[in-house]
Amino acid sequence: MARLAGVDLPREKRMEVALTYIFGIGPARSKELLEKTGISPDLRSKDLTDEQLSALRDVIENTWKVEGDLRREIQADIRRKIEIGSYQGLRHRRGLPVRGQRTKTNARTRKGPKKTIAGKKK
C-alpha cells in the first residue's frame, strides 16, 4: 500500500483520485502534481514504483502544506480571528455561520439540534 504524507492511498484507485485522499490535495492539485512528476493519471497506486513514490513525496513536501500542517494552520487562523475580536472570530466563538448565511431558518449544522422552548403553545 502506497503511503504519502501519512495517508495510506487506496490500492485500486487511479492516482488522480487516490491523491485526493490527502487533506489539502483536491482534483486540480492532484492533476498538477501528476504533471510535475510525469506520472500517468490512469496508473493505479498499487503499480507505483519506489522512484515515482519518492518523486511524489518530494513535490508534496516542498510545494504545499498538507494534512497535519494544513489543519494546524487553519486552526491557528481561526484562533487568531477569535483573539483579535473580528466579526468572523465572534461568529466562530458563538458557533454560527461565518460567511453571511441566513440563520433565521437553516444553519442547523452549525447551530446544532433545535433547542425547544418550554411553554410555547399554539
Swiss-Prot record:
GO terms for cellular component: cytosol; small ribosomal subunit. SUPFAM superfamilies: S13-like H2TH domain. Keywords: Ribonucleoprotein, Ribosomal protein, RNA-binding, rRNA-binding, tRNA-binding. It comes from the Bacteria. Coiled coil: none annotated. One of its GO terms (biological process) is translation. GO terms for molecular function: rRNA binding; structural constituent of ribosome; tRNA binding. Residues 93-122 are annotated as: Disordered. NCBIfam families: uS13_bact. Located at the top of the head of the 30S subunit, it contacts several helices of the 16S rRNA. In the 70S ribosome it contacts the 23S rRNA (bridge B1a) and protein L5 of the 50S subunit (bridge B1b), connecting the 2 subunits; these bridges are implicated in subunit movement. Contacts the tRNAs in the A and P-sites. PANTHER family: 30S RIBOSOMAL PROTEIN S13/40S RIBOSOMAL PROTEIN S18, SMALL RIBOSOMAL SUBUNIT PROTEIN US13M. Belongs to the universal ribosomal protein uS13 family. Part of the 30S ribosomal subunit. Forms a loose heterodimer with protein S19. Forms two bridges to the 50S subunit in the 70S ribosome. This is Small ribosomal subunit protein uS13. It comes from Corynebacterium jeikeium (strain K411).
